[in-house]
Amino acid sequence: MIEIKKLCKSFGRIKAINNVSLSFRQGEIITLLGPNGAGKSTLMRLLTGFIYPDSGQITILNNNIEENRIEALSNIGYVPENSPLYPDMTVFEYLCFMSKLRNICDSIFEKRCQEIIKNFSLAEVINQKIETLSKGFRHRVAISAALLSEPKILILDEPTEGLDPNQKHELREFIKSYGQKNLVIVSTHIMEEVEALSTRVVLINKGKIIKDTTAHALKMLSPSGNLDEAFRNIIQNRSLL
């Protein structure tokens, strides 16, 4: 679904993404894991077209992102960690607005909206203004809006940030279900999430891919079988790669 070849992106002298090549397929849930400033968010912004690479190529569902930008990006739903919302709108008004931007017809929007309200427990806030909502509810609204067009590729940056334990569980179950027939890419620092969600774990540090593996294989690199310990060992000791 996504092919990345020799991708590079620098900001001044800092190589945020350095010669990255990856391939992602339908039915995968990819976790991007790395320390702060590793390049995870930059890679996500490149995949979603918010910034352009200095060199290299991104192909999404056989569409080169530079040559067929609209076609490529139409298949992606993206939720950054701090999603820009319209605080004066109600939740329903915002979902309507986003559906119009994506040219979703009214009948399909009505069906999708009902599903989303149920899946993300939004019934109690659907007519409230976004500015009155908690951070957790705002994040759920942002994810809901990204799902209106039923994208084949869903990209989530810190998706459970601000959610309570029950909300985290519900969202993780949804991600696992959605990832069975689509591609989901998640950036997170929560090891419990990495273990619960991932079919693949891609470790990034200093703009480079240092390991492409599974959560189980990653755990085995720790004497105690601890995922967080294994991650720290890899970042601190390249001899474990």
Language-model regions, residue ranges each:
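Helical segment within the ABC ATPase nucleotide-binding domain
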Residues: 168-180
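Catalytic Walker B motif of ABC-type/P-loop ATPase nucleotide-binding domains
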Residues: 154-158
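Conserved ABC ATPase "signature" region
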Residues: 96, 100, 107-125
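Helix-to-loop junction immediately C-terminal to a conserved catalytic motif
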Residues: 48
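Conserved ABC transporter NBD signature motif
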Residues: 56-67, 71-72
